[in-house]
Amino acid sequence: MNSLLMITACLVLFGTVWAKEGYLVNTYTGCKYICWKLGENKYCIDECKEIGAGYGYCYGFGCYCEGFPENKPTWPLPNKTCGRK
């Protein structure tokens, strides 16, 4: 019984540690979602939760999300340069 409990706890911890995170990106332009109020930011929290991420905040003037769904892209996108040639 104790072994089963330990295995379950390890699997939960493993999923938490390896969750995807990164900057929220506009897939059309390739640009990060811009924010101005650094730290906890309602705009970033709402935008990150809308795509299924667990939490979001403003970091480096971009919305940074934790707990991204694996099927959602993060910034930078491979073939998008956000307006740069």
Curated annotation (Swiss-Prot):
GO MF terms, alphabetically ordered: sodium channel inhibitor activity; toxin activity
Database matches in InterPro entries: LCN-type_CS_alpha_beta_dom, Scorpion_toxin-like, Scorpion_toxin-like_sf, Scorpion_toxinL, Scorpion_toxinL/defensin
Predominant location category: secreted
Disulfide-bond pairs as recorded: C31-C82, C35-C58, C44-C63, C48-C65
Alphabetically ordered keywords of this record: Disulfide bond, Ion channel impairing toxin, Neurotoxin, Secreted, Signal, Toxin, Voltage-gated sodium channel impairing toxin
Transmembrane regions: none
One Pfam family per UniProt: Toxin_3
Signal peptide: 1-19
Subcellular location: Secreted
Free-text tissue specificity from the UniProt record: Expressed by the venom gland.
GO cellular component: extracellular region
Residues covered by the LCN-type CS-alpha/beta domain: 20-83
Domain of life: Eukaryota
GO term, biological process aspect, one: defense response
Function, in words: Beta toxins bind voltage-independently at site-4 of sodium channels (Nav) and shift the voltage of activation toward more negative potentials thereby affecting sodium channel activation and promoting spontaneous and repetitive firing.
Family, per entry: Belongs to the long (4 C-C) scorpion toxin superfamily. Sodium channel inhibitor family. Beta subfamily.
Domain writeup: Has the structural arrangement of an alpha-helix connected to antiparallel beta-sheets by disulfide bonds (CS-alpha/beta).
Name assigned to this protein: Toxin Cll7
Organism name: Centruroides limpidus
